[in-house]
Structure formats: structure tokens, C-alpha cells
């Protein structure tokens, strides 16, 4: 880790945040860019920009208390959900699930603040959070899959459906699948060891997040002309 290396080498500059906004700036630049994957960085940056900075960003760290944070989490349920350029908000107001995602981000940020000796304790360590209803997802049965395959007249789509079902591939993994991930050699088939091993996935990534992370973990980027026409 870069932070640990700088601490050991004596080149680490301790954070000096005074407000929640200051803390978030240093949390993102010191912790986030070195720890999070691209998709995590982008989603947490969005949560911070839309639901944390506008509401409590100007608060001084010394004024952030458990009581204030409990009220903040409660009030978030009446905040309108923000749509992004590519993803439309599914509900009018924030759901308990999103509030819990905000809490995870703040809990981690305040933990770093305690570690950096900017706060004496984490004000959300024992926070009261809205209850989240867990809904069971509808899962295709083998019969439904068979009907879908029979109704599909596109060979590539039929193959994608088969792979997604038989290999439990997520959409990004399915779209990132290349021949180097596949082992169907005669020897592997004979031994019953034919396999698919996916270590990459296709994602739509915000250019700003890509720049912030200096292209970390990106294996291939489509040319702008391709991205704008497909």
C-alpha cells in the first residue's frame, strides 16, 4: 500500500481536515484511489457528491455527533434520488439500501479520521439505520430457460444465455469473456476438466473516475469513435 510505504519512509504528510468536506477530499485521494476498484470508486464518489457533501459537507469534524448523524440518516429517506448520465434513479426518494451504502462510506471515512487523529471516535459506529426489506429475486428455472432458448432466434444471444445460466456469469463477465478464458482442449474434455475462468469484465466507466485512478486495472479502452457510435 502506498500510504504504508510513505509512513515507513517518512514521506507521508498527515491529513489536516477541518470539515467533513476536507476529510472526504483526503479520504478519496489518500485511501480511495489506492484501495478501491474503478466501479467502487465511481459509485462512492457519486454517493459523496449527491448525498453527503450537500447536506453535511460544511460541518466541522468536531461538531459531528452520533445524534446528528442518526438524524441525518433519517432525513436521507426524504431526499430525492439523483439520476446519473447513464443510470436513471429507480425510486423518487432514497431507499434504506442507499442510506446504508452512504453509511458504509461515512463509517469508513470516519474510521480513517480516527486513525489519522482528526477525530477521537467514530460518530457513526453505533448508528441507527432504517430497516431494509430484503426481497427475494426471481430466478429462472430450467423450464423457463428452455423456453427462452427455444424462442431465441439469435445464435449469439442464445450462446450468451446458455453461458450466463450454466457458468453463473454476471453481465460484465459475460461481455468480457474472451478465448483466453476458455479451456476446451481435447485433453481437458477427456479428463472432464473443461472450464471457463473469467478474470475481467466489461464496464462503462466515468472518464473522470478513470483519470482519478490513472487508468488502474483497465486492460483495454474502446476508441472514442467506437464508444460514441455503438
Which residues make up each language-model segment?
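Short, amphipathic alpha-helical segments that act as regulatory/interfacial helices
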Residues: 4, 48-49, 103-114, 161-165
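Alpha-helix C-caps/helix-loop-beta hinges
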Residues: 58, 79, 109-112, 116
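N-terminal DNA-binding module of tyrosine recombinases/phage integrases
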Residues: 1-71
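Short, conserved phosphate-binding/catalytic loop or strand-edge motifs used
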Residues: 62-77, 125-130
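Short, basic/aromatic-rich helical patch in the C-terminal catalytic core of site-specific tyrosine
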Residues: 69, 106-110, 174
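Charged catalytic carboxylate motif
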Residues: 23, 47, 68, 101, ...
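Basic, Lys/Arg- and aromatic-enriched nucleic-acid-binding interface segment
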Residues: 82-85, 89-96, 100-102, 115, ...
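Conserved tyrosine-mediated DNA breakage-rejoining catalytic core shared by Y-recombinases
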Residues: 126-129, 138, 143-146, 177-230
